[in-house]
Amino acid sequence: MDYFSIKQDYYSGNFSHVLQDIEKQNIEDDTLLFYKLKTLLALKKYELGVCSNNKLGFVFDLYYKYLQSKDISELESNIKMETATPYEINVLASAFAIDGRLDESLEACVYGIDNSELPGVTELLLLAIQVALLDGQVSIAQTMLDNFINSQEDAITSEDELLVNLAESYIKFATNQDTTSSNFYYFEELSQTFPTWKTQLGLMNLHLQQSNIEEAQGIVNVLESDYYSVEQSEAAELYKPHFLANKITLAILTGSEEVDDLKNQLEQLDPNHPLIKNNKRLNTEFDEIVAKYKV
């Protein structure tokens, strides 16, 4: 079965289309179930017991419980790496990453990539690269991508290539490579071909990386238009924290007086957002330095 359109919609943030496409299928395999349940989680529409008679569905139920309680023990005890599928390992590795156990998350991904040929290995690669970059291990992320491409040679399908290209774009963004060339064009093409909140924010990130203030402001105006803010209200709500974070960066670049107000909005909406947490950490460190050298 060809999953290309489903994966393209998922990774471009077109979640409603993902569910519509999956509903049209006459079968339900682990790949369809994985993307269906991931989409329901993203839309905050997940309900326990949706597919609990299926092992992967059961694992997602445990993952959902973990997201509510932050107690990972039940999920961790029910997944045995030796027998788990790549999709099941993906769920556990995601929980490890959220739990701050980045080394274990990466180890789980690597185990799944190296020991399975079942569907879901490329998804594990993408997650592994995201985790490695989050942990500041850029060289490991690049090595994993290179090894995967070399090992697959001509066996990479179009849907695999979709995830490989996305992984490569993350590495380039993290290392400031091809910011004005291939990586920029990648996000620009995505935003034009699949005009969603996620793709527009991705392109805005590239503009902010280059300090293209006018272009970044143009995307803010686009996302605040009726087409995005009203007709795509569900996505607008979902991506609001990311939008606010980008607006904060833009406000800092322009020297706007709105910075503090935007930070307050983001903190109220998502107090655990990385930008807010890093800002608090830096403020604490600064206060400690001041106190240390205060006469």
Predicted feature locations:
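Alpha-helical repeat scaffolds
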Residues: 16-24, 45-55, 70-82, 102-114, ...
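Residue at a conserved register position within TPR or TPR-like alpha-solenoid repeats
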Residues: 9, 40, 65, 96, ...
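Structured C-terminal portions of repeat-based eukaryotic scaffold domains
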Residues: 173-295
